[in-house]
Amino acid sequence: MNIKKMMLGALAFLTSLTLAACGSNDSATKSDNWTAYESEKSVTIGFDKTFVPMGFEQTDGSYTGFDIDLANAVFEKYGITVKWQPIDWDLKETELNNGNIDLIWNGYSITDERKEKVLFTNPYMDNQQIIVTKKSSNISQVSDMKDKILGAQAGSSGYSVFESQPAILKDIVQNNDASQYATFNEALIDLKNDRIDGLLIDRVYANYYLQQEGIIADYNIIDAGFENEAFAVGARKSDTTLVENINKAFAELYKEGKFQEISQKWFGEDVATDAVKN
């Protein structure tokens, strides 16, 4: 066999391996994978590691938060370990449908646009979009944002409704757009330093962050005027058994009082939706 034939043979072999790997991954993203999660005793959840108090990284590198505790409790019922995978939140659905993660679970709001890409569990917590401003700015209502600079997280549900319902906020802010940030942390730093005038953000994040920083008295929390949202877990559309079992675990955890225990730990109240309670 000459060198040319050897090289062609090696190339064909490598190509077959690549196609096989791609085919395997493609199959996994189009299948109901519950038996695989059970046999491997592992599921990978994608999250934004800066989203306090839902799921975030501590100074020692470990992850904590309401969603972290809740997800771990859910999968403990099935003997499955959660692998937490930090992701670029703007690419979350891509990461899910490419098979890099199995679930999106991190203050993930249900929207019509997202329903086209993922299969949602029952909602487990309600949320609201608000605008945070400095009290020193004299911006205390939505109309005060006229010609002001607004910030928002790229890929967030807040930015999505900002775009889809322009009459509420987009049409009045400077340049009819919002400065987009990779994380809320970056946006809050710019708000503190007067590089933006207001920040469109999840109420749950803003309340926790400002209280933890001890600066909540220095900021206004303004209802942005959008409809309230609901947090749920996002799965691939083929993973129906996974979604059914998460819903089942939600209900069981609530009946056992574990859901309320986790809720009290992070919010000081029971945040469960009726879908969880019933």
List PLM regions with ranges.
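Acidic, polar ligand-binding/catalytic clefts
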Residues: 72, 81-144
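A ligand-binding cleft/hinge motif common to bilobed small-molecule-binding domains
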Residues: 91, 108-116, 161-164, 189-193, ...
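Periplasmic-binding protein-like
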Residues: 49, 126-133, 211-248, 267-278
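Ligand-binding cleft/hinge of the Venus flytrap
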Residues: 57, 71-79, 158-180, 210-215
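Extracytoplasmic small-molecule ligand-binding "clamshell" domains
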Residues: 28-107, 256
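C-terminal motif of bacterial Sec signal peptides marking the signal peptidase cleavage site
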Residues: 18-21
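Extended ligand-binding regions for polar small-molecule ligands
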Residues: 23, 68-77, 143, 147-149, ...
